[in-house]
Amino acid sequence: MNTLTKLTIGAVALTGSFLAAAPASAAPAADTTASPALGSQVSAQFASVTIRNAQTGRLLDSNYNGNVYTLPANGGNYQRWTGPGDGTVRNAQTGRCLDSNYDGAVYTLPCNGGSYQKWLFYSNGYIQNVETGRVLDSNYNGNVYTLPANGGNYQKWYTG
């Protein structure tokens, strides 16, 4: 083995050890591979379901103006969402797609096929925006936004 080959192998091994040592609170990469911080990716294809926040128990809700928030369960279609399998999450009442931006705002817009409207679902409850890599988050006031994954229950959501 020549010196260049040894240096290349050493550099790759060293780089790999730095990548493996990244803290779990680091911002998630916006790709479709499983991340130790996010868990295993699961199917985003589902019929009309509710999306419940693990910490607050409130349901993801929306309106025709595009506002997104959480409310206690009320049985309405504004609290129901569909996942047709293309990565979008659509409000059952309005037909609009869940959308976000790099500032962390979450809202709905008419579906346009863009990556800001694509979401990845993970086995431990994270819902990650494909474009920004940030995950859906909430609080007891009903606000909904995205932040880098931090392991908290406000960032975990369950369909039902």
Curated annotation (Swiss-Prot):
GO terms for biological process: regulation of defense response to virus. It comes from the Bacteria. One of its GO terms (molecular function) is carbohydrate binding. Changing residue 155 to A: Complete loss of HIV fusion inhibition. SMART domains: RICIN. Residues 27-46 form a propeptide. Residues 1-26 form the signal peptide. InterPro entries: Ricin_B-like_lectins (IPR035992), Ricin_B_lectin (IPR000772). Gene3D superfamilies: 2.80.10.50. Interacts with HIV gp120 and SIV gp130. This is Actinohivin. It comes from Actinomycete sp. (strain K97-0003). The gene is ath.
